């Protein structure tokens, strides 16, 4: 996990590539917007980021805070990246 914003390391699941949005675009949005706390459909607390990427596309990003069992540094795991224009 080499990506980071501020104090957080960032990891990405494979499913974040579903809409063919690159990690750099997701990192840009995460670094330039304030997250909103949300609860996922699985009832897990998460952060929602919505904002324009470096190309002007508005993206929505959902990230979970992960606390490893071995007391390693917590990190954000991005589980969803999608252009908001695809939202019905």
Predicted features by range, described:
Residues 1-88:
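Ribonuclease/tRNase effector modules and their secretory precursors
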